């Protein structure tokens, strides 16, 4: 049986984010990274698709430095639902095959200034496993429920008031994700 310590010397975790020009987004992802690292012991980095640093390739370099015997990177897009970024952009940026044809550029020849054309190549000889988007995980549903209940308990509405709950999400250009 392989021990967790042996795995920690060979496997690292890459949390993939879209990236934002707003500094609090980076602070939030670094906090998630630090909490995950502390809870699991696995070397963990955040890699950003665009706008923020480190890039996905830069984060892979950081993991290689932190784990000299690195054999495998488990990459998870920190996205709620599958879409263009999780199925096309992130696999491409990791040097993997996209999971489907890009409706923005079906021939795969992106314009010279497109971020997929100008991104650094990932330099890693080991295995990269790309996990799916987070999806409707029960733990996420618990967080949503807790936040809504906190809001309702802080509400100044009386018991006769009617309250609706609206979940807002980004959406996707993919045909099967238009609901």
Task: State the predicted function of each range.
Residues 1-179:
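Extended amphipathic ligand-handling, pore-lining, and cofactor/metal-binding catalytic surfaces
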């Amino acid at each position: 049986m392989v021990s967790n310590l042996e795995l920690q010397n060979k496997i690292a975790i890459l949390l993939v984010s879209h990236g934002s020009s707003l500094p609090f987004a980076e602070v939030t992802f670094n906090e998630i990274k630090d909490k995950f690292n502390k809870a699991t012991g696995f070397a963990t980095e955040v890699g950003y698709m665009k706008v923020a640093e480190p890039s996905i390739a830069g984060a892979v370099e950081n993991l290689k430095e932190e784990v000299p015997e690195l054999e495998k990177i488990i990459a998870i897009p920190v996205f709620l639902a599958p879409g263009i970024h999780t199925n096309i952009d992130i696999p491409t940026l990791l040097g993997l095959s996209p999971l489907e044809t890009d409706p923005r550029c079906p021939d795969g020849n992106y314009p010279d200034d497109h971020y997929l054309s100008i991104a650094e190549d990932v330099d890693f000889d080991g295995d990269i496993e790309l996990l799916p988007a987070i999806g409707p995980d029960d733990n996420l549903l618990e967080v949503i429920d807790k936040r809504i209940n906190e809001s309702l308990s802080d509400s100044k509405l009386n018991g006769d008031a009617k309250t609706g709950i609206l979940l807002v999400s980004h959406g996707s250009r993919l045909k099967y994700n238009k609901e």
